[in-house]
Amino acid sequence: MMLGAEGGEGFVVKVRGLPWSCSADEVQRFFSDCKIQNGAQGIRFIYTREGRPSGEAFVELESEDEVKLALKKDRETMGHRYVEVFKSNNVEMDWVLKHTGPNSPDTANDGFVRLRGLPFGCSKEEIVQFFSGLEIVPNGITLPVDFQGRSTGEAFVQFASQEIAEKALKKHKERIGHRYIEIFKSSRAEVRTHYDPPRKLMAMQRPGPYDRPGAGRGYNSIGRGAGFERMRRGAYGGGYGGYDDYNGYNDGYGFGSDRFGRDLNYCFSGMSDHRYGDGGSTFQSTTGHCVHMRGLPYRATENDIYNFFSPLNPVRVHIEIGPDGRVTGEADVEFATHEDAVAAMSKDKANMQHRYVELFLNSTAGASGGAYEHRYVELFLNSTAGASGGAYGSQMMGGMGLSNQSSYGGPASQQLSGGYGGGYGGQSSMSGYDQVLQENSSDFQSNIA
């Protein structure tokens, strides 16, 4: 029997596959035939631990009849993406919202947006002009550059309020010069994740004794270039307070700014249980749908990789750095869905600049994948697909998360890495919480009661 919305299961659906820049208004329009409880307040977006939108949301409806209407929207499109709609309940929604997203529930409402696809050499003044009429906080624009001092084609912008940031999102796909600009929701947590390293790691400017080539094969170390890479996750002057202004100055304990006022510190990614290749490099996936690239031109940038996979829209790109501080010619690319990751494999042997990138597919559906040998392998896929509402790429045992970790260095490198935290920390996908919920639903029910 369906219980009322005040207690018990309620009238909730879960939505998956939303565009990254999706707003509450767009979700309301998508469900225009349904009565959403409290309007926009009844739409609860799910965020990654970095504060990025996960492409999923819960929608609270007014009755069981409205739930049935909402479920009929399953597989309809929003923009160029089809959206999946599943039946859910208050128990699942409350648990997921509590265990996902950055620590502060308000960090996704602090006025940040992320821009992608900026023209080379784009200045902060051009961004101010692009957002003409929308108030940006002082020192609120940051143009990250890569380790070679070149623009990544991205920017973080903080507006005076979340309402203004929502207006900024409506400029998605408008142009600066000849380039159209993609705009995504962001947060202070995302900025800190990418730019604010633990201070005690800043001294590790050279690779440690275990950061040598080959240490990753079956070796339980952080892996290739860990000291250098974590050192590179500088600076913003101790976090948020040190954003560089329009003129440029030393930002604090990182590399500082260049003469254009651009931050010279840039982080490509964090750590994870996914270990690829000979050096044991690490990459943290928030979706569980990753493509590993090898054979890239050494001058390739993140923007080059985004363009390589066009018209697909990767969620994130991580370019690997070796223990000598140089690029390895490898990268990890994260996609929103298993389907996108599989579609990316069509780029097998496609050219990037003067080099072609070869392909190797290691994709599993509902089971952990083995490591395959192939002499032409240069592009790896680590992506798992489960049934609707099921766990993606995760197995649970006694409440401990054992992530499906695909290793590409041979049998010796295959390891199981557990992650604890209500069964969530060790999962390789945002959708992995479904399986945990099933195993612990009785506990959640008793806690709520």
UniProtKB/Swiss-Prot annotation:
In-chain residues carrying the UniProt-annotated modification Dimethylated arginine = R233
Kindly report the protein's main subcellular placement as a broad class: nucleus
N-acetylmethionine PTM sites in chain numbering? M1, M2
Per UniProt, location of the Glycyl lysine isopeptide (Lys-Gly) (interchain with G-Cter in SUMO2) cross-link in this chain: K35, K87, K98
sequence repeat placement: 234-249, 354-372, 374-392, 418-433
Q: Where does the record place the region 2 X 16 AA Gly-rich approximate repeats?
A: 234-433
- In this UniProt entry, the residues modified to Omega-N-methylarginine are R233
**Record-listed Phosphoserine modification sites:** S23, S54, S63, S310
Spans through the membrane: none
Q: Which residues form a coiled coil?
A: none
Tell me the compartments it is located in: Nucleus, Nucleoplasm
The family database entries (InterPro entries) matched by this protein are listed as: ESRP (IPR050666), Nucleotide-bd_a/b_plait_sf (IPR012677), RBD_domain_sf (IPR035979), RRM_dom (IPR000504), Znf_CHHC (IPR012996)
**One Gene Ontology cellular component:** nucleus
The function of this protein is: This protein is a component of the heterogeneous nuclear ribonucleoprotein (hnRNP) complexes which provide the substrate for the processing events that pre-mRNAs undergo before becoming functional, translatable mRNAs in the cytoplasm. Mediates pre-mRNA alternative splicing regulation. Inhibits, together with CUGBP1, insulin receptor (IR) pre-mRNA exon 11 inclusion in myoblast. Binds to the IR RNA. Binds poly(RG).
Swiss-Prot/TrEMBL domain comment: Each quasi-RRM repeat bound poly(RG), while only the N-terminal QRRM bound poly(RC) and poly(RU). None of the repeats bound detectable amounts of poly(RA).
Record protein name field: Heterogeneous nuclear ribonucleoprotein H
Protein encoded by which gene: Hnrnph1
